[in-house]
UniProtKB/Swiss-Prot annotation:
Gene that produces this protein: atpH
InterPro entries per record: ATP_synth_OSCP/delta_N_sf, ATPase_OSCP/dsu
UniProt entry tagged with the keyword Amino-acid biosynthesis: no
Keywords from the named record: ATP synthesis, Cell inner membrane, Cell membrane, CF(1), Hydrogen ion transport, Ion transport, Membrane, Transport
Keyword presence, Cell inner membrane: yes
Domain of life: Bacteria
Membrane topology, from the record: Peripheral membrane protein
Family: Belongs to the ATPase delta chain family.
Function (record text): F(1)F(0) ATP synthase produces ATP from ADP in the presence of a proton or sodium gradient. F-type ATPases consist of two structural domains, F(1) containing the extramembraneous catalytic core and F(0) containing the membrane proton channel, linked together by a central stalk and a peripheral stalk. During catalysis, ATP synthesis in the catalytic domain of F(1) is coupled via a rotary mechanism of the central stalk subunits to proton translocation.
GO MF terms, alphabetically ordered: proton-transporting ATP synthase activity, rotational mechanism
Organism: Laribacter hongkongensis (strain HLHK9)
Name by which UniProt lists this protein: ATP synthase subunit delta
PANTHER family cross-referenced by the UniProt entry: ATP SYNTHASE DELTA CHAIN
Length: 178
């Protein structure tokens, strides 16, 4: 996963700069989201991965799925990815593009993993605390991970805040071993 993100980052940054310079962040965001969602479909994924298809056929297929959302620049991106056998990066490129777009718009996404589902009040309190810490609007993406035992693990950008029982036990175990 980390390798995909590393390889996808330059593509996402290049597309973001282009979209920002042209004032087309929303259009690129929509096109990349459509491409990522399309590749999540088993039939499309299988068709793209089919070694009997040429790069041009794959680009035409994906361009057809996008319809009028596939401008010249989007087709250029698809051609570059197909030529380098990196179409599988599209979901990671879309995700990183969205992160860059949110930073540009002054919004951060916080991935919150908790041992139990968060209440509305807990979510609001977490969002307010993170907004105060980062000085930006916060969008929460919550998930439940029972292996945390209790507490939460928060991921904002590249920063991890581990306030889980599992994390604390892990830290204590390391301390005891040394």
């Amino acid at each position: 996963m980390a390798e995909l993100i590393t390889v996808a980052r330059p593509y996402a940054e290049a597309v973001f700069r282009l979209a920002k310079d042209e004032g087309r962040l929303a259009q690129w965001s929509e096109a990349l989201a459509w491409l990522a969602a399309s590749l999540a479909e088993p039939a499309v994924s299988a068709a793209v991965a089919n070694p009997e298809r040429t790069e041009a056929e794959v680009v035409t297929l994906l361009g057809g799925i996008l319809g009028d959302k596939a401008g010249h620049e989007v087709r250029n991106l698809l051609e570059a990815l197909a030529e380098n056998h990196r179409l599988a990066l599209l979901p990671a490129i879309a995700e990183q593009f969205e992160q860059l777009k949110q930073v540009e718009e002054g919004v951060l996404t916080a991935d919150i993993a908790s041992a139990y589902p968060l209440t509305e009040a807990q979510s609001a309190e977490l969002a307010a605390t993170l907004k105060a810490k980062y000085g930006k609007e916060i969008v929460l993406k919550a998930s439940v991970d029972p292996s945390l035992i209790g507490g939460v693990r928060i991921l904002v950008g590249d920063e991890v805040i581990d306030a889980s029982v599992r994390g604390k036990l892990h830290t204590m175990a390391i301390s005891l071993k040394s």
